[in-house]
Amino acid sequence: MSPWISPATLKPEIELLVRRWKLPHDRVAEVERLLAAQSEGGTACALLPITPTHAAAWGSACQPLPLTPSDVTLAPSPLVLRHHAGQPHLQAWRFYSAEQTIASDVLARAQRAAPPLARPISALLADLGPDQVNAQQTKAITCALEHTLALIVGGPGTGKTHTLARLLALLIADHPEKPPVIHLAAPTGKAADRMKEAVEAAADHLPATLPEKTKTALKTVAASASTLHRLLGFNPSTGQCRANATQKLRSDVVIVDECSMIDTLLWQALLAALEPNTRLVLVGDPHQLESVAAGDVLGSLVRFARSHPGTALDRVWLELTESQRFRHRPGIGALAAAVVNCHADAAVRLLASHAAPSDNTAPADGLAWLGDHGGRFAWEHLPVTVQAALIAVADAPTPAEALTALAGVRLLTAHREHTLGAAGLNDAIQRHLTQRPGIKRPPNQPIIVNHNDPETRLTNGSIGIIMDVAGNRAAYFPPASADAPPRKVPLGQLPDTSAAWALTIHRSQGSEFDQVVVILPPDDSPLATRELIYTAITRARQCVYVWGGEATVRAALGEQAVRCTLLAASLETLTPAPSPAP
């Protein structure tokens, strides 16, 4: 459930409607479905089966007036009735308001020039030297230097982080005596950690034409990467942010990664907290799964920009398409392309031609199909290379070695509770590793943190390892910097965690692993979608094993996750027609 919505607000809203409007039972049920769906995630409006007569009745009852938990008894209506594409849409006020403000702010930023630079952009780009960025990346950097909004999207390995590192280096080098205040953020702790690691690594490969102090400053910026909640100062007890519309975040540049994971209300909070002249660079992959909570903001922005050439939003979005990650693993890249384009026949043919190697080696082009094994999991069904990687995690002698090994392998599944869900897979793997003959100590156990914890400064999605060191069993997490030892957290201080040999695909977003076993859901699962499979297979750096049947692949590629959102309608209303070419 989104932290921006309190479950306690649902009951008063429904009671208000019943009391004020004397709603019949069928419409009470509609409202319950709408409010529950929006609080649990998924949709930012509802396409309810409203007849013209009912639409007129709703129209007289729904008024676009603000509603908050504190004034629920005073507001005439928590709902808004909107007509779009010939269909009545019933929408909760909070999402109507959020989408309106997001559309307005995004379009204003797209049209606003960024604060002036000390040097011409051409001179800054020349500092990078030759062959540092391709044409697409150069265009993305130029856009971010010119505007207060840049939307940079692309699949894995297309150079998003490479581009960001060079953009940041140029911004720092432009004001060497007083570098800009820069914040890096991502929706989850794991995504923020990945962002930090990637930018730090990119800083080591900046061209020699840039001053050494620029590289040092960039590493300092990378080390400060945080979750969006931490950046905004979100207080879970009040549902409010320290940085907001009246108390802005002091920042010259804000870069947000993994934007597909951000829900509507968090987008609204982010935009409200920024000064008009703050450079905002939004980065993500619109083909991935949407946010767990309500909304599909990144996807809506990209689709609108793509379908409205010449508009302000079209001028500030850039897609990077030249992927390097799968150049030596073409099987993964080919499957990802087939999935994105919903080419079920091509995906099935590709998998059928990639049976798991019989010689217990990793597949040469990074892809293997394991079949579905009758829908039942057994350790023996895992490829030998995956078994060896899991054992390396379990038996690593030091926390540093265990964490390094853990980054190399993961099982990903659609469900948490299911025959092949994360909970059952974790139990089965831990049981096998514990019952091996001849082991001398309990196996190390990977864990994932389930919520932000200010006391330990562990964030939702942080991955660690529980293990014995010198007879003392504790949890260890990746260090804050590459040259520091792993962070030790006593078991008594750990927040709520779950085992992490296997993760749900949703929880894996923002992560990468050398080897990934993707366990597909049954073909009749509502989670079997194109976005789910794409997100899972693109978590792999070197090798992906697909566990599942042909029927699931075909069912998933016939289903695209569609969020009911009216953000595009709000953008349409507020966007002026593009000027004709001279």
Whereabouts are the PLM-identified features?
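Intrinsically disordered, low-complexity N-terminal extensions of AAA+/P-loop NTPases
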Residues: 1-58
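Residue-level signature of catalytic and energy-coupling elements of molecular machines
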Residues: 51, 102, 227, 257, ...
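Interdomain "pre-motor" coupling segment immediately N-terminal to P-loop NTPase/helicase cores
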Residues: 53-119
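Conserved pre-motif I regulatory segment
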Residues: 121-149
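ASCE P-loop NTPase helicase motor core
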Residues: 138-141, 145-354
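Conserved helicase motor core of P-loop NTPases
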Residues: 287-447, 451-456
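C-terminal accessory regions
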Residues: 449, 462-578, 582
